[in-house]
Amino acid sequence: MAGAKEIRTKIASVQNTQKITKAMEMVAASKMRKTQDRMAASRPYAETIRSVIGHLALGNLEYKHPYLEERETKRVGYLVVSTDRGLCGGLNTNLFKKLLSEMKDWSDKDVQCELALIGSKATSFFASVGGNVVAQVTGMGDNPSLSELIGPVNIMLRAYDEGRLDKLYVVTNKFINTMSQEPTITQLLPLPAGDDETLKKKSWDYLYEPDPKALLDILLRRYVESQVYQGVVENLASEQAARMVAMKAATDNGGSLIKELQLVYNKARQASITQELTEIVSGASAV
């Protein structure tokens, strides 16, 4: 059994770690609330433009944009959104696991995959496991801006425009609630038709001013950018929620460990006192 002094040192060490994890839990909770506000502010725009684009995909368009046309799938692209920091449980691991499973399905069909990575965790992961990485961006912090995402998005859109990609997806964690974050893979291009039954029952048609091509070129590009940005914001909210839960679990586990060490310490101290009393009694008997 370890000595009483050694056990006291371990207890002090765990208590110090517990203070750190508690502070990190509080910081994550504060950041999560701010990120949730940002997510709530951007979500109406993302959902509205997704709805409009869904109508377009179902409509009888005067001009058929390339982003609306299905192609034979030979190459697919993924915009992968991860975190820049760790200590957020299995958030990134679950996302990468889902992505690798889908990439394997494509590989079995002889379809090649290209990756544009957002976040240092995705960069380090695919540096170790391998992958055709064509773009990456890291260090966006807690206040990501669309301008920081334009680089990877433009690279993937250019590849799609030039026919080097036949499908484009965004991979991110969807924020459900504080305790639940769901890894999702959403198709961006070709434009998926709206899945709302009420939309499918209607015949959507549009008049474009001044020119359908110019309008759709801008609108569809903004659609892709908005969905990627919304994915980044939701992933950030998921990160802070997962980190808050992970740090709370670490703090609670620290408390349990302290109780166990305190019990061991009490037993060690009791054994030491018993031994001293035995030695005193033995010495007195010898006299």
Curated annotation (Swiss-Prot):
Organism in which the protein naturally occurs: Photorhabdus laumondii subsp. laumondii (strain DSM 15139 / CIP 105565 / TT01)
Subunit structure: F-type ATPases have 2 components, CF(1) - the catalytic core - and CF(0) - the membrane proton channel. CF(1) has five subunits: alpha(3), beta(3), gamma(1), delta(1), epsilon(1). CF(0) has three main subunits: a, b and c.
Function: Produces ATP from ADP in the presence of a proton gradient across the membrane. The gamma chain is believed to be important in regulating ATPase activity and the flow of protons through the CF(0) complex.
Membrane topology category: Peripheral membrane protein
Chief site of localization: membrane
Family recorded in the similarity comment: Belongs to the ATPase gamma chain family.
GO biological process, one term: proton motive force-driven plasma membrane ATP synthesis
Name recorded for this polypeptide: ATP synthase gamma chain
